[in-house]
């Protein structure tokens, strides 16, 4: 399993946004992270995301524009 860290690209597995690509923007605690990308920026339970081996270069609490630019540069959006 890939590490849960800022910049880790994930796939949403549950909810209305299931199947969409997202990036971890902030780690809140052992159960929750803040995600952004092709999904609305929100807090998400780690049980609802599947981390991938891909990672983009982001700082903690990066803006939505920075996240979208990083995903575009990596060819993931």
UniProtKB/Swiss-Prot annotation:
The keyword S-adenosyl-L-methionine does not apply. Coiled coil: none annotated. Disulfide bonds: none annotated. InterPro entries: KOW, Rib_uL2_dom2, Ribosomal_eL14, Ribosomal_eL14_arc, Translation_prot_SH3-like_sf. One of its GO terms (molecular function) is RNA binding. HAMAP family: Ribosomal_eL14. This is Large ribosomal subunit protein eL14. It comes from Methanococcus maripaludis (strain DSM 14266 / JCM 13030 / NBRC 101832 / S2 / LL). The gene is rpl14e.
